[in-house]
């Protein structure tokens, strides 16, 4: 029956087509019929075919994703272990280290102990690149006379116009809510903010003990050969420096550029210096120096030799020193005495940096602290010319904070500058016990940065003379108290 129905439909369609071709039917009806035939002749996808296609596409995508995941897992599980098995065991051990926190803490403690341990007495390994220059002329060996201080006007540095405003200013800088200095509040803040900080005071005692042990076990850094003789007619001590042997190397080339400075202590104004001998550890000087001194004064004098390594662009390294005293006990003295002395290693803390004289005066009613920088002597030479360009910087300190700072003028090309300059700080009486002064002698450098020659402190937190000077100032108000202070390295 379905076949007969299809044949009947086919005949009906042919009949309609012939009628349209003859024009027996309307044109619009024929056009609708033609469009209907075209639509029936166009191939169409059935709904089941569309569903199967979509399902096939989804299955293919999932299969590709699973295939990629399987490849990645197989590479991780199989390829990486196989590659590591091909490497030697030593490289694997070096690349993979277990995370052992206990070992890490132990290593940090060992590193800190190594950091705190003092260097060896003769730092042969601590070398630096040295750029030498021609020998220092003898014209720079003469002592520098102190500048005449007569007629020098005292300069005052005053900042605020009224004492009440100045006192309020310093209270604001001290973060005080009332005139009384709240020590407990500052200590509480320090405890709260000090968690996790490195406390240097925990290591001071150990470093001092190490320094004492190092000095007791110090060994010589070479030998110095020189000749002493006293001329009774001219009352002169004749010193001939012959040579030095077995000096430690200070340069990367394994050599040094040594020279020797000579003082007849306690006088440091008369200084002699040998020429610089380049790239040698066994220099031969053969230079003669004269020190005018009466024979009766020899017992109280000391001959001080300082052996340095010369460097044009940085500080000269101190190799060591030799001190000779009790000349009258030497064999054959005052005739010619040939001596060999060990060059003793000294740290930078033992280097004589010079002295600074200043006075302190406090006026309780006005709340004014005046420090007058008078002069300095025997400062350490920082320039190639054998001199320095010193100035003094004074800082008002409180609990490690710098509240104010002032500085003097710069004195050119001298090791014995004279200033006579007053610096004034406004400190209320209730705060005078909580502050201290930090004084630094600086070397001015026009090209590079200014270098610190030495420092000293005065106040209740200072040591020895600095504390005594401060206490004497408070005991005698309105009276200038002057003292000499030795300069030390900045810590």
Swiss-Prot record:
Its cofactor is Ca(2+). It is found in: Cytoplasmic vesicle, Secretory vesicle, Synaptic vesicle membrane. It is a single-pass membrane protein. Residues 1-52 are vesicular. Belongs to the synaptotagmin family. The cysteine motif mediates homo- or heterodimer formation via formation of disulfide bonds. This is Synaptotagmin-9. The lineage of its organism: Eukaryota, Metazoa, Chordata, Craniata, Vertebrata.
């Amino acid at each position: 029956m379905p076949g007969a129905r299809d044949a009947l439909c086919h005949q009906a369609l042919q009949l309609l087509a012939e009628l349209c071709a003859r024009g027996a039917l309307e044109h619009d009806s024929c056009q609708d019929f033609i469009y209907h035939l075209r639509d029936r002749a166009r191939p169409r996808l059935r709904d089941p075919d569309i569903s199967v296609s979509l399902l096939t596409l989804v299955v293919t995508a999932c299969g590709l994703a699973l295939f990629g995941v399987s490849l990645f897992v197989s590479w991780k599980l199989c390829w990486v272990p196989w590659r590591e098995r091909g490497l030697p065991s030593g490289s694997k051990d070096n690349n993979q280290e277990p995370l052992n926190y206990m070992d890490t803490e132990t290593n940090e403690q060992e590193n800190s102990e190594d950091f705190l341990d003092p260097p060896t007495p003769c730092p042969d390994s601590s070398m630096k690149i040295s750029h030498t220059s021609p020998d220092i002329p003898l014209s720079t060996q003469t002592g520098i006379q102190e500048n005449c201080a007569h007629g020098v006007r005292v300069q005052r540095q005053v900042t605020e116009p009224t004492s009440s405003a100045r006192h309020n200013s310093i209270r604001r800088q001290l973060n005080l809510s009332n005139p009384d200095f709240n020590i407990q509040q500052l200590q509480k803040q320090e405890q709260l903010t000090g968690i996790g900080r490195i406390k240097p005071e925990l290591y001071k005692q150990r470093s001092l003990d190490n320094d004492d042990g190092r000095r007791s076990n110090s060994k010589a850094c070479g030998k110095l050969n020189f000749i002493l003789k006293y001329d009774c007619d001219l009352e002169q001590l004749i010193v001939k420096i012959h040579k030095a042997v077995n000096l430690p190397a200070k340069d990367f080339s394994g050599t040094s550029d040594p020279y020797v400075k000579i003082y007849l202590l306690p006088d440091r104004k008369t200084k002699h210096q040998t020429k610089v001998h380049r790239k040698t550890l066994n220099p031969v000087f053969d230079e003669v120096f004269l020190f005018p001194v009466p024979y009766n004064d020899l017992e109280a004098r000391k001959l001080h030799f300082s052996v340095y390594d010369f460097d044009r662009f940085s500080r000269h390294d101190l190799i060591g020193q030799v001190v000779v005293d009790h000349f009258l006990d030497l064999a054959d003295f005052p005739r010619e005495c040939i001596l060999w002395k060990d060059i003793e290693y000294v740290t930078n803390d033992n280097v004589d940096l010079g002295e600074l004289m200043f006075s302190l005066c406090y006026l309780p009613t006005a709340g004014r602290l005046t420090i007058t920088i008078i002069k300095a002597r025997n400062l350490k030479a920082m320039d190639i010319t054998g001199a320095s360009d010193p100035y003094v910087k004074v800082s008002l300190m409180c609990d490690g904070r710098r509240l104010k700072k002032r500085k003097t003028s710069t004195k050119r090309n001298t090791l014995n500058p004279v200033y006579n300059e007053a610096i004034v700080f406004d400190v209320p009486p209730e705060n005078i016990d909580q502050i201290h002064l930090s004084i630094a002698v600086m070397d001015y450098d026009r090209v590079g940065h200014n270098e610190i020659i030495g420092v000293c402190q005065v106040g209740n937190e200072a040591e020895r003379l600095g504390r005594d000077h401060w206490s004497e100032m408070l005991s005698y108000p309105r009276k200038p108290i002057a003292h000499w202070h030795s300069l030390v390295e900045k810590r």
